Amino acid sequence: MASAVVSMVPTTASRFALLQVDSSSDSDSEKARGAHSSGKAHSGSAARGKNKGNEKKKEKRRKKKEQQQSEANELRNLAFKKIPPKASPGVAVQEHLTHTVPKVAQEEDWQQWQQRDVQLTSDMYEADLEKALILSKLEFEESKDNGNGDNGVPQSKKVNKKDKRKNNQGKDKPLTVPLKDFQLEDKHAKKQEELKSPPLPQDSGFFNKLEEDVTKIILKEKRKEHSTDVTEQFATPEYSMEPVLKDGRTEVLKQEIEKKEVELKQMKSIISQWEAKYREVKARNSQLLKMLQEGEMKDKAEILLQVDELLSIKNELTLQVTTLHAALEQERSKVKILQAEQVKYQGGKKSKRTAELEHGR
């Protein structure tokens, strides 16, 4: 079950997958296979023809291995910037090309390789985590099945399968099963077991929790890697403001940066001066506001006092006017009385005069 699941999980291909390690085990295994096949070969012309065909195949394989090794060495030299050996002509051509390629292109290639490595490592880590998850699920299911009782295939069937495999191995030893057929058989067996095995509704929450925990762990590690990458970029001297440019543009950029820094310092000093002036003006304005408020209060108090005085004067004048008006009316009445008496007195005089005149005649 575990091998089938591991084969089902997709794995990411890296640029180091092409690199092959030379080991004597492959040659020993090939020699053993050749000896085994030659020992079991039939005598006669058919055996000789087979041996010739095997020798041709071996020569082709050796040529392919040499080509793959040369390509792997070239890839190693490109990846790690090593000086390749001068043995093979293809490596010499690669050395000439690496010398002719400019430094800028090499650095760009190196950055691209770094990005690819980061992506590949993250993908491989996720794939490994998925594999571990699936394996843990399978182990959990197997342990639960073992605890509840063997719900799978009975032992008689297992024994029959083993006997069949032994018989097949004894009969068809020279035949080899390809990887694809083996994986397809494992997949079919897994599907049949999944169909046979009853669903586990109680364990869905457990697996969901496992997946959530794994996703959280992946996110945390990605954040940590990102933060470490950012800090390393800022800490490394490669992050310094000196990119590899042509025609001495780095010096020009340095001078411009220095000028900008000087301008920034000047602007900061000007801003500090203006801040001090602004504080002084603010203090003065606050003082003026206080003075104006005090002056307004004084003016208001004086005006109120004047209004009170005027009101008192008005009251006094109204009293005087009323008294004068009463005296005037009294005088008018007196004048009227005197006029009436005068009229009476004048009338008496006229009557006396007329009487005297009549008496004198």
UniProtKB/Swiss-Prot annotation:
UniProtKB keywords: Coiled coil, Golgi apparatus
Main location: Golgi
One GO term of the biological process aspect: signal transduction
Parts forming coiled coils: 51-79, 246-296, 326-346
InterPro entries per the UniProt record, alphabetical: GKAP1
GO cellular component term, pick one: Golgi apparatus
Ranges of compositional bias, category Low complexity: 35-48
Location within or outside the cell: Golgi apparatus
Region (Disordered): 22-111, 140-183
The keyword Ribonucleoprotein belongs to this UniProt entry's keyword annotation: no
Biased composition (Basic residues): 158-168
PANTHER family named in the record: G KINASE ANCHORING PROTEIN 1, G KINASE-ANCHORING PROTEIN 1
Family: Belongs to the GKAP1 family.
Function (record text): May play a role in the regulation of insulin-dependent IRS1 tyrosine phosphorylation in adipocytes.
Name this protein carries in UniProt: G kinase-anchoring protein 1-A
Source species: Xenopus laevis
Gene that this polypeptide is encoded by: gkap1-a
